[in-house]
Swiss-Prot record:
This is Cytochrome c oxidase-assembly factor COX23, mitochondrial. SUPFAM superfamilies: Cysteine alpha-hairpin motif. Belongs to the COX23 family. It is found in: Mitochondrion intermembrane space. Disulfide bonds join 73-104, 83-94. A motif (Cx9C motif 1) lies at residues 73-83. Residues 1-19, 36-49 have a biased composition (Basic and acidic residues). InterPro entries: COX23, Cys_alpha_HP_mot_SF. A motif (Cx9C motif 2) lies at residues 94-104.
Length: 164
């Protein structure tokens, strides 16, 4: 049985040279004409079409109803399932899509662990417009809502429900 500690052995076949050594990003670009690691907004590598911290995902998260599960890597998941359907459920044909999904999930979990929060709320605008007289800012409510989400993971309950 192969040693699982060596991550190079776990690479899909399309990412290996003929002699079995892993390809560099430049070799992958030359062979397939695709940049698998496009630079993200902040100069970090991005491995797939999904970006868990993108503004569109933040807005989508805020639009979810109570207790609805939120998956920031839904697009990568759909792509891998569609690939399986197209290829008669042969997993070997869809390794690239599975790797993209795994990388998205890793990025999501690492971001969550590093920051302690799923999203940064400083760039989210007030959906109701400017706060009127007597209203509090919208941002503290978002922070409280996200904090409750972090505590419950798959079940999202509004902060007001805990204030009863």
């Amino acid at each position: 049985m192969a040693d699982k500690s060596n991550s190079e052995d776990n690479k899909p076949k399309f990412m290996k040279n003929e002699d079995g050594t892993p390809m560099t990003q430049e070799q992958l670009r030359q062979k397939y004409g695709v940049d698998f690691t496009k630079e993200g907004r902040d100069g970090k590598l991005k491995y797939g079409p999904d970006d868990p911290t993108a503004m569109s995902n933040r807005v989508q998260f805020l639009a979810k109803a109570d207790s609805q599960y939120y998956d920031p890597c839904a697009e990568a998941s759909k792509m891998s399932l569609n690939c399986l359907e197209r290829n008669n459920y042969k997993k070997a044909m869809c390794e690239e899509y599975f790797q993209i999904y795994r990388d998205c999930k890793k990025m999501w979990v690492s971001n969550k662990k590093q920051s302690g929060e799923i999203f940064e709320t400083e760039n989210i605008t007030n959906p109701a417009g400017a706060a009127t007289e007597g209203q509090e800012e919208w941002f503290p409510l978002v922070d409280q809502y996200l904090y409750i989400l972090l505590l419950t993971w798959n079940v999202c309950v509004p902060y007001e429900a805990y204030m009863v």
